[in-house]
Amino acid sequence: EPVEKGVHIAAAHIDSPRLDMKQHPLFENEETAYFKTHYYGGIKKYQWGTIPLALHGVIIRADGSSVKVNIGEDESDPVFCVTDLLPHLAQDQMKRSAGEILKGEELNILIGSRPFRDDDVSEKVKLNIMAILNEKYGITEDDFVSAELEAVPAFKAKDIGFDRSMIGAYGHDDKVC
C-alpha cells in the first residue's frame, strides 16, 4: 500500500549491558584460564558474578577471514562465568559497598582449568584453551586483537508472574526501545 495510507515504524537498539573482551584477553592464574573484560553499559557489577554467560561476536583471523562466535546459547554448549567467593570466605569482600562487591577489574570470565599435557611448558591451562580454540575455530592468540567478543547472560526469555503478564530476559528493555 502507498505510504499515504500510513506506516508502522519499529525501532530498536542493541546496546545492552555486557562484558567485552579486551584485545589481549586470555590469561592464566592459579591453574585456571580467564578472559579479561571491561564492562559496557550501566551494570551492577555484583549481578554478574557466578551467572552463566554466553560468548557472542566475531574474530578476524590473520588471513582476513572471519569466524562468528555464539557459544553458550545452545543446550549442548558450555557456558562461562565470573567467579566469586563463597560467603564463608568473603568476610573482607562483604565489607565493600554494593558498587564495589565485585570490582571492574575482577570481572574476569572463567574459561577453563584443564592443563595441556606437556611437562615442559608453562601456563598449561592457557595453552590447552588456545589448542581447543585453534582446533575448533582456527584462531591464534594474536587474532584476539581484531576480535569483537562479548559475554552476555545465558538465560532464555521467560514469563514472569502467575499470570504470565511480564517477561524477564537479558536486554529486553534495551532491545525493544
How would you describe each model-predicted region?
Residues 1-177:
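N-terminal hydrophobic/helix-forming segments and targeting peptides
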